[in-house]
Swiss-Prot record:
Keywords: Ribonucleoprotein, Ribosomal protein, RNA-binding, rRNA-binding
Protein name as annotated: Large ribosomal subunit protein uL22
GO molecular function: rRNA binding; structural constituent of ribosome
Function: This protein binds specifically to 23S rRNA; its binding is stimulated by other ribosomal proteins, e.g. L4, L17, and L20. It is important during the early stages of 50S assembly. It makes multiple contacts with different domains of the 23S rRNA in the assembled 50S subunit and ribosome. The globular domain of the protein is located near the polypeptide exit tunnel on the outside of the subunit, while an extended beta-hairpin is found that lines the wall of the exit tunnel in the center of the 70S ribosome.
InterPro entries listed in its UniProt record: Ribosomal_uL22 (IPR001063), Ribosomal_uL22_bac/chlpt-type (IPR005727), Ribosomal_uL22_bac/org-type (IPR047867), Ribosomal_uL22_CS (IPR018260), Ribosomal_uL22_sf (IPR036394)
Gene: rplV
Gene3D superfamilies noted in UniProt: Ribosomal protein L22/L17
Keyword Nucleotide-binding: no
GO BP term (any one): translation
Pfam families attached to this UniProt entry: Ribosomal_L22
Similarity-based family: Belongs to the universal ribosomal protein uL22 family.
SS bonds (residue pairs): none
Length: 119
């Protein structure tokens, strides 16, 4: 797939120590938002994972500015995708010699920012 007019930049954060379900709450919140507004929302968000999402978004903005020369004031988050990464399996001792398995989930985050056209 070859694109002639590349006016979008991407950034990814892999193996984030949070479940995809929790990460998707924050990713869905910032989807289709202007970058400046999303950065403010992520700064004051009470969610623990919002700091990692903010760092990934700042990386996407830096990629757009430095690699493609896009105007950062017109950037919009067009895609914020959450994927499943590895699952660490741990054992928790229980009563009467039993044990249960604990799953520690990891996630991947992909953010795409696009320069919005002025009409």
């Amino acid at each position: 797939m070859v694109q002639e007019n590349k006016n979008f930049a991407t950034a990814k954060a892999k193996s984030i120590r949070v479940s995809p379900r929790k990460l998707n709450l924050v990713a869905a919140f910032i989807r289709n938002m202007k970058v400046s507004e999303a950065l403010v929302q992520l700064t004051f968000s009470p969610k623990r994972i919002s700091k990692v999402v903010k760092a990934c978004l700042q990386s996407a903005v830096a990629n757009a500015e430095n690699n493609l020369g896009l105007d950062i004031d017109r950037l919009v988050i067009t895609n914020a995708t959450v994927g499943k990464a590895l699952v660490m399996k741990r054992v928790m001792p229980r009563a009467k010699g039993r044990a249960t398995r604990i799953n520690k989930f990891f996630s991947n985050l992909y953010i795409t920012v696009t320069e919005k056209e002025d009409n």
